[in-house]
């Protein structure tokens, strides 16, 4: 007889700095209400994201009825990657009037390749268009 499947009781999506998860908000309250061992998650997440320190890494936590959990880390948000590559703190308050930085086509392609597993795109060209659109909406000019 095959083992019984665990019943899923919750799906939590968070964006946490890599290697810096701690029981303080937003992690503690989100996991606490599902009865998950918060420190166990923090240690596992910090170990899994140690190599990406400094970046914000989205995580999808699946909670089961026996209070156990599994989590999947995603690629950093496209907006954060664009800010990092452009070397700016934040996007433009008026993106269609005020441009704050420039990205080359090669930089956009590099970001698209990094984000490809999480993007809803069939090929790299479609992914580049998605990233370029995000950049434009932040007031970042894409050259090339």
UniProtKB/Swiss-Prot annotation:
Database matches in Gene3D superfamilies: Ribosomal protein L11, C-terminal domain, Ribosomal protein L11/L12, N-terminal domain
PROSITE patterns noted in UniProt: RIBOSOMAL_L11
GO terms for cellular component: cytosolic large ribosomal subunit
GO BP term (any one): translation
Keywords: Methylation, Ribonucleoprotein, Ribosomal protein, RNA-binding, rRNA-binding
Membership in a protein family: Belongs to the universal ribosomal protein uL11 family.
Protein name (database record): Large ribosomal subunit protein uL11
Lineage per the UniProt record: Bacteria, Bacillati, Actinomycetota, Actinomycetes, Kitasatosporales
């Amino acid at each position: 007889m095959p083992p019984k499947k665990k019943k899923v009781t919750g799906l939590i999506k968070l964006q946490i700095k890599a290697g810096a998860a701690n029981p303080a908000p937003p992690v503690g309250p989100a996991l606490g209400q599902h009865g998950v061992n918060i420190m166990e998650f923090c240690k596992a997440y910090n170990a899994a994201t140690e190599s990406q320190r400094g970046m914000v890494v989205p995580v999808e936590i699946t909670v089961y009825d026996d209070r156990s959990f599994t989590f999947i880390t995603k690629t950093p948000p496209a907006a954060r990657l664009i800010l990092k590559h452009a070397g700016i703190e934040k996007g433009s308050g008026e993106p269609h009037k005020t441009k704050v930085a420039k990205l080359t086509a090669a930089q956009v392609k590099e970001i698209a390749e990094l984000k490809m597993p999480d993007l809803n795109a069939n090929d790299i060209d479609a992914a580049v268009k998605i990233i370029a659109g995000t950049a434009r909406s932040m007031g970042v000019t894409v050259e090339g």
